[in-house]
Regions:
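Gram-positive cell-envelope targeting signals
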Residues: 1-29
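Active-site-adjacent loops and short helices of periplasmic peptidoglycan-processing enzymes
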Residues: 25-190, 194-203
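Domain-terminus/edge residues, biased toward the C-terminal soluble/receptor-binding domains
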Residues: 169-170, 181-244
């Protein structure tokens, strides 16, 4: 059952590359769906239609590409950025670490940015932060993870980009930990799949990425926060629930 959740989460996150009209540092195509390259392979099974502009399906064990819909075209990753944020965090921090929210984190608590309403001086564990970043896509939590794990946001972003290079992601550059709009923040479906594949090899990553719900205990400044996934592929109440 856990493996089904990881696969569903991987499928959803790898396909949701969000277009943006921001002036870009590279040529980022948006608004136009890519052609399915694998459909031109003789004898290869035709895949079902996807609504995403680009997509890729790879074998998690070997990395072999099974489906290619513009997999190497640049796109803005938006909150799928958090796949890398989580991976770098679980590899470089303990779930028991205490995270204290500074101006770095709370600056991203506003109406048009996904957040869980963290307050200046509020504390919770790194583990709680991981779940908030993935289940609620909390941007202020991602910023605070970055500062706490990296010593500074800038250093954590460097860690993200170095990790991307190490994984063979040649068309990816991160500018922040949450996926906020930035011309210098881009990736491809293929690179994102490589990151997800690496993450699935980490037990802590797998547990967080496949979580359907989680409760952050009461903090020094807030009551307990109950969170439930917004990813329809792993939510049983959704008509898009993937049973694997």
């Amino acid at each position: 059952m856990r493996k089904k959740l990881w696969r569903a989460a991987a499928l959803g996150l790898a396909c949701v590359l969000i277009p943006s009209a921001t002036v870009q540092a590279v040529t980022v195509n948006f608004g136009t769906a890519a052609a399915v390259a694998t459909d031109s392979i003789q004898g290869w099974p035709a895949a079902p239609a996807t609504v995403s502009e680009t997509a890729v399906l790879i074998d998690a064990d070997t990395g072999a590409v099974l489906y290619d819909k513009g997999m190497d075209e640049y796109r803005y990753p938006a909150s799928t950025t958090k796949i890398m944020t989580l991976l770098v965090a679980v590899e470089n921090a303990s779930p028991r670490d205490t995270v204290t929210f500074t101006e770095t984190g709370v600056r991203d608590v506003n109406w048009d940015s996904s957040n869980i309403g963290m307050k200046l001086g509020e504390t919770m564990t790194m583990k709680d932060c991981w779940y908030a970043a993935i289940i609620e896509s909390a941007n202020e939590v991602c910023a605070q993870i970055a500062e706490t794990v990296g010593g500074s946001e800038a250093n954590f972003i460097n860690m993200m980009n170095e990790k991307a290079k190490a994984l063979g992601c040649t068309r990816t550059h991160f500018a922040n930990a949450g996926g906020l709009p930035d011309a210098n923040h881009y990736t491809t479906a293929h690179d994102l799949a490589k990151i997800m594949r690496a993450g699935l090899q980490n037990a802590r990553f797998r547990k967080v990425i496949g979580a359907v719900s989680y409760t952050i205990p009461a903090t020094n400044m807030s009551e307990a926060r109950r969170m439930h996934t917004h990813m329809p592929l792993i939510a049983k109440e959704s008509n898009l629930y993937y049973e694997g």
